[in-house]
Amino acid sequence: MSEAGTGVLGLLGGTFDPLHVAHLRLGLEAREALGLGELCFIPAGTPPLRALPQCAAAHRLAMVERALAGMPGFSVDPGEVLAAAGTSAPSYTVATLERQRRQHGPQRPLLLLLGADAFARLESWHRWRELFALAHIGVATRPGHEIKVGAGDTALDAEFNARRGSAADLAGAPAGRIVPFAITAL
């Protein structure tokens, strides 16, 4: 496994309202399946495509910090929560990835983790095509939640077909691949 700070950095964002065992399981399985050097949880500030979280951002951040305390190779990035404090402006993934890229440099491989359901809606995300220049995308599948793109003629189908790779591809470039991986159903 890669050393923290140099290997592939996994990024798992979400409202975490509340954080639950499926989030933690996804992180653990992604780290193992994809050989991630580190996995960073990123609590959302103000999600643009979901209802506002019931729990305050500071509480959601504290939940994630507490859950990950003492777990080697796992970290928490408070950036979205801090940026959203005192504003209702949406927290866009592309802005978070731009910040991560500045923080970790142009060469460190970054991997944004998504579930198959979120990936299927990627075209609705703000500046979605720019995500590929900033990070790889790992798409978690489980029974009943497989990837439903690639066979059609949408822009996302074309991106999926052109960028599909494997875990072995992640360390070879800082961004640009789409890597499906299976997780167990809970």
Regions found by a protein language model. Give the residues of each.
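Nucleotidyltransferase catalytic core that binds NTPs
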Residues: 1-186
